Amino acid sequence: MAVVTMRQLLESGVHFGHQTRRWNPKMKRFIFTERNGIYIIDLQQSLTDIDRAFSFVKDTVAHGGSILFVGTKKQAQEAVAEQASRVGMPYVNQRWLGGMLTNFQTVSKRLSRLKELEEIDFDDVAASGRTKKELLMMRREKDKLERTLGGIREMAKVPSAVWIVDTKKEHLAVAEARKLNIPVVAILDTNCDPDEVDYPIPGNDDAIRAVGLLTRVIADAVAEGTVARHGGSAPGEAGTAEEPLAEWERELLQGDTDEQSSAANTEEPTPAEAEALEAPADTPAEPLAAEADGETVAEAPAEVETAAEAPAEAEAEVEAESATPAEAEVEAESATPAEAEAETPAESTDEQA
């Protein structure tokens, strides 16, 4: 599957070239036709060249290389900075300093100076040990270095390849790259020289949407190459590659997946545990000790109620036993204490006889 479709190229205006009077005859093979005094670029060849450049960039990054994004014209500054930052690659979107590649040793010294200035706290005058004027001059130096070298702050060596927007404007970058035999991948408009570029992509280098689309394609190739270099799988759909993850992010995501799987295994009871829960327990287990204590406490009020009901039942039984015929009650009530004492000795005498 192509990394970009013909419809996307047409919507972005990649097929528009320069005026017919501003052209390079070497670009004739990439021109489809002329309309209203403007050349129309053959997008079929552009698609083929995009796939070729995409594969080259992906393989270069997969083998540990780096890509330098270069685009100092206003139409390309934002797209170059955004896409290069997304994939963690160096970029130059302001002024190209002469010798940035051929004299990289000197440039690396300026990068070290920039990092030193970034560590200074310009707001704390007393702690810095410098005067306000010195701090002001150093702040201006820092701002200037950030503007020109901020995009290549982390570039420790010469890049493996260079992505360039508008080779005519960036002729210094093209010359330095060719001198160092660094492959050049670039957008070629109808006024450019294709012999200076190793992997040309015929297209419009003046439209913001066209530059943004092609730069995003190269950034996607860098992203896929980074994923392949770290042993990951490439994204399913070409042209929509996601930003490569760092190693600590991969470990964090892997740890979250393991925790979720272990939690799922803990929540689901095993068949043996399910049978144990369904079967009645003959003897109380240790985990049920708390429940047993709760049941004992709950039964205590019931025992108190039973004890309170016992006297009432005893009184009822006494009343039932005392329920004798009316005559017996009358005799019992009419008997005096004297008669009761007289009857007692008589009964004892008869027993002795």
Curated annotation (Swiss-Prot):
Q: Which domain of life is it from?
A: Bacteria
- Which is an annotated GO molecular function term of this record? structural constituent of ribosome
Low complexity bias locations: 263-311, 321-339
In its UniProt record, which GO terms are filed under biological process?
translation
**Ranges of Acidic residues composition bias in the record:** 340-353
* CDD domains attached to this UniProt entry: RPS2
Which SUPFAM superfamilies does this chain map to?
A: Ribosomal protein S2 (SSF52313)
Which InterPro entries does the annotation name? Ribosomal_uS2, Ribosomal_uS2_bac/mit/plastid, Ribosomal_uS2_CS, Ribosomal_uS2_flav_dom_sf
**Positions of region (Disordered):** 256-353
Q: Which PROSITE patterns match?
A: RIBOSOMAL_S2_1 (PS00962)
The entry's cellular-component GO terms read:
cytosolic small ribosomal subunit
Q: What keywords appear on the UniProt entry?
A: Ribonucleoprotein, Ribosomal protein
Question: Which Pfam family is one of those matched by this entry?
Answer: Ribosomal_S2
Please give the HAMAP family that the UniProt record associates with this protein.
Ribosomal_uS2_B (MF_00291_B)
Q: Which family, according to UniProt? A: Belongs to the universal ribosomal protein uS2 family.
By what name is this protein known?
Small ribosomal subunit protein uS2
Native species of this protein?
Beutenbergia cavernae (strain ATCC BAA-8 / DSM 12333 / CCUG 43141 / JCM 11478 / NBRC 16432 / NCIMB 13614 / HKI 0122)
Q: What is the lineage of its organism?
A: Bacteria, Bacillati, Actinomycetota, Actinomycetes, Micrococcales
